[in-house]
Amino acid sequence: MLVLVLLAACTDVHGGAVELSWTLRPESGDSSDLFVNCDTGVDGANPVERMRLDWQVGAITGSASWPCTDYHGVTGFEVPSGSALLTVTPECATGDAAPITYTAPTPQERDVSVGNTVNLGAIEVFVEISDCGSGVGSQACICG
């Protein structure tokens, strides 16, 4: 019991936390799969490496990211208290995915309080994986 009390005393709480889970779905519906992996295996599309959560509370901004293949993430208690605008962005090995290659949920506004966790639930990020490449009629694909 004393160990639990000591461990709890070591937790650094400056704000609230945010928890979310994610799945990737094909944008066009051409895929026979309802969901796709972070590495879609499609020529012209490269793996989504990480998922990033950005927040803005007043003039304060911050972010946290997790390996895409975790499909779940929780920030530390670092999100400032107040009305937070929360956005999710897929990240490629070379940086942010091009906005035309994915559709994420619209920014969510949530009230954050010190020591509490806001749960965004399970979100779906739609990724472009059809007609990838540089030929005529092709389009930009996720992380391509």
Write out the residue ranges for each language-model feature.
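Disulfide-rich extracellular modules and peptides
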Residues: 12, 40, 70, 94, ...
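Structured interaction patches on ligand/partner-binding surfaces of diverse proteins
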Residues: 67-70, 91-133
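Sec-dependent signal peptide recognition
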Residues: 1-4
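Bacterial lipoprotein signal-peptidase II cleavage site
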Residues: 11-17
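Short, acidic Ser/Thr/Gly-rich low-complexity loop/linker segments typical of extracellular
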Residues: 56-73
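Short Pro-Gly-centered beta-turn/loop motif in secreted/extracellular proteins
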Residues: 68-94
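C-terminal motif of bacterial Sec signal peptides marking the signal peptidase cleavage site
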Residues: 6-9
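Short amphipathic, basic-aromatic surface patches that mediate peripheral association
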Residues: 21-43
